Amino acid sequence: PDNVEYIIQVNDNESLVKNINPILPSLNELLHLEALQGLQFFIQQFPKTHTEFIISAHTIGESTKLLMSCKNEERVFTNLLKHLKIDARNFTAYSDKKIYTHGTHYKKFYFTFQNGIFSVAEDIELLKNCIDRLKSRNNLLSNEDFAEIYMMIEKNPNQNWLVVNHKGYFQQAKKIINEGYYPILSTIEKNCS
């Protein structure tokens, strides 16, 4: 979706979890990663061979919400439904796709499977936007600047990557950062352009 603030390309989930846990409280303030553990729950349900995935943060209204997507097989998705004890007939229909819900009254996650891609989000509108974007095939890779960065990421698959969309991220960051830091933030934003 267009409202992306940043993308984390995860090529080694074990390394991500190990390195991010000690600094997660600070990262929550900067990157709004509160839903990361919920997304990790879904990754842990997949066979160990499914280790690459993308987490993206999106501006939804006044807040930031996370979306996670990865390539997968339909049988793995079917097994996920069984493992989570979700009746395959219990879904919300959207644009000829099925959206399933998992969670509690405290936190819910919405997920779907389409064209070999498993996607899960903490916001149903974000997931619907993802479904629409996957159908259109018009995504960030059609942006020349991002495509160039993504080529570099693909050449270095042994590490995890954080790619910040300075146009989206800094607008959201200004809502949570002390005003005294605005000049520094503006300088960083200007240098990113």
Model-derived segments and spans:
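A conserved glycine-rich beta-strand in the N-terminal activation segment of trypsin-fold
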Residues: 103, 107-177
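Structural boundary/hinge residues at secondary-structure and domain interfaces
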Residues: 1-101, 146-191
